[in-house]
Amino acid sequence: MTLTTFALIRHGQTDWNAERRLQGSTDIPLNDVGRGQARDAVAVVSAYEWDAIVSSPLSRAAETADLIAAGLGLPVVRRLPELSERSFGPAEGLQAGPELDALRIEGGFRGAESEDEAADRGLTALEALAGEFRGGRVLVVAHGTLLRVSLSRAVGRTLQSIDNAALNLAHHHAVDGWQLEFFNGGPVMETADA
């Protein structure tokens, strides 16, 4: 059974994360806490050997990937636009409150990418990487909502929000689908195939 192993890492913290603002596709950089989280992630992911590091092109994910790559002595081989965060449209930059509530519709926000669209895009990108690096180990740095909805679809159950720079370890098999071994840095007791 040939497994492709993925470390799926959400970028480190940004000022908008700290302020609890929706970021989406808005390109917000890491803050100092986020840079520290990225450097701290090296200790966790260095327990494995990686064949490739890939990230979203948004600066918060790209810088997280660059910091992890430097710590591992590996290059980032690609920035994939398909790994960009879900677009929240006019809700980006807003915090919880009446203005955000006015944009809510079933499944998200008016003028935003739907959860299903984001899951389709993210899972398609991950499965393409699984095909390209079949039997290998790929470290992917992306975004919380994109990873959550893609992983939820892959394993067939709803997952909670993904922590900044935490290890999410998943395995892909072309026939048996996806298995989640670690989520938010902790072991998963039950795995489910897609």
Where are these regions (language model features)?
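Active-site signature of alpha/beta-hydrolase-fold catalytic machinery across serine-
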Residues: L67, V149, R153
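Generic beta-sheet signal
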Residues: F6, G136-G144
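Short beta-strand scaffold positions
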Residues: S55-S56, D120, V141-A142
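Glycine-rich phosphate-binding loop signature in dinucleotide/nucleotide-binding domains
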Residues: A47-E49, L129-G136
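Active-site-proximal alpha-helix that buttresses catalytic centers in soluble enzyme cores
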Residues: T4-L72, G111, D116
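Acidic, low-complexity terminal tails and accessory targeting/binding regions
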Residues: M1-L3, L74, R79, R86-G97, ...
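Short active-site segment of divalent metal-dependent hydrolases/proteases
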Residues: T14, L146-L147
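Short glycine/proline- and acidic residue-enriched helix-loop micro-motifs
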Residues: E99-E117
